């Protein structure tokens, strides 16, 4: 019998960084507020112990250790930054809750309070994400893009110390650790589409733990789930990993139908880019939130028709484990085949 049924504290697995523990802490606090005792358990991951770029150390490096502990039963649930999860399904687990999302936009933190358009040509801007690198280069500002790893504090320090003129990071991370005051510009999606699922958390547990799945469902936000499902379906259909130069942002918005009634629609924007910024393909779609996964796949197919595969194949070929023994790029599968009870598997 699981902790959810016995009343013993639920053990929440998390990485040990300030950001990860703050994120997991919001889940712990929500469970405690609902009358379910919970505590954090810190798990070391290979990603925390490596200074290599994420695209070199591999997809899932921040989540595999948490899943190992979850499978072993040493924790009852794990809290992930959803964008770090591989799209490949794992039938042992289920995403039982996706809490309300933080602002998914990227943020610029620059010296002297500068915004992106005020940075001089040759300014050193730190980021290692190919998606950000590609979109920054595509703006044609002549910036010098510098590789960047480390926790948020160490990234910000490289600007304060004068080593870099600016860094680009997820706004959600700064918000969660109370550092939004350092943001000099929130980058609008028209400038830079965020990573699929950026700003969203995934609360994962074992698929056979029915009582815990039911308990965690109370934390689920339907609009966030629909948006994340659409964005990750697009990523999976493009056969791209979480480090590929792919951006996506979905939002549930209200509109009027033909009879003047207010209805909810899912608006999804996506892009695929060449890492050198020479080309960025963009497309968008609007549809029923209940068809979120289908909309994501449809938009991905539109991007593929525009030439996205040719832009992404070079990046896919360099990711660890990206090639099969035949030399062909191995397509990852979408995790939507293992939905929670609240997720539309279409």
From Swiss-Prot:
Residues 335-346 have a biased composition (Polar residues). Its EC number is 2.5.1.61. Belongs to the HMBS family. NCBIfam families: hemC. It comes from the Bacteria. This is Porphobilinogen deaminase. Pathway: Porphyrin-containing compound metabolism; protoporphyrin-IX biosynthesis; coproporphyrinogen-III from 5-aminolevulinate: step 2/4. Residues 317-346 are annotated as: Disordered. Keywords: Porphyrin biosynthesis, Transferase. GO terms for cellular component: cytoplasm. Tetrapolymerization of the monopyrrole PBG into the hydroxymethylbilane pre-uroporphyrinogen in several discrete steps. Monomer. The gene is hemC. The keyword Transferase applies.
